[in-house]
């Protein structure tokens, strides 16, 4: 009988650890996503500044300006794909019957 109580206790402990690990993973994902969004924002600002410099004739290095614009465009496309995949995964999860 004592072994059964030990098993129940171990099961409760493992369930507690699983929920704590899931929360930790969610927090890590949220931090990673926030960092990527901040990087995207910086790339967009850099691209906009480069376009403004080109439009006003104040550009010092056209090649670097073109790289900044291309980087901003690529970053935005990548983030849109991540968003689309996240939405697709969410829809698939909501369709799953339990």
From Swiss-Prot:
Biased composition annotated in UniProt, kind: Low complexity: 1-23
Per the UniProt entry, what are the Gene Ontology biological process annotations, in alphabetical order? bacterial-type flagellum-dependent cell motility
Give coiled-coil spans as residue ranges. none
What top-level branch of life does the organism fall under? Bacteria
Query: Where does this protein chiefly localize?
Result: other
Region: Disordered, residue numbers: 1-24
Q: Which UniProt keywords apply?
A: Bacterial flagellum
Spell out the molecular function terms from Gene Ontology.
Answer: cytoskeletal motor activity; structural molecule activity
Membrane-spanning ranges: none
**Gene Ontology cellular-component terms listed:** bacterial-type flagellum basal body
InterPro entries, A to Z? FliE
Residues making up the signal peptide according to the UniProt record: none
A Pfam family per the record: FliE
Subcellular location, record wording? Bacterial flagellum basal body
> What PANTHER family does this protein map onto?
FLAGELLAR HOOK-BASAL BODY COMPLEX PROTEIN FLIE (PTHR34653:SF1), PTHR34653
The entry sums up its family as follows: Belongs to the FliE family.
Query: What is the name listed in the Swiss-Prot or TrEMBL entry for this protein?
Result: Flagellar hook-basal body complex protein FliE
Q: Which organism is it from?
A: Campylobacter jejuni subsp. jejuni serotype O:2 (strain ATCC 700819 / NCTC 11168)
Q: What is the lineage of its organism?
A: Bacteria, Pseudomonadati, Campylobacterota, Epsilonproteobacteria, Campylobacterales
What gene name does this entry carry?
Answer: fliE
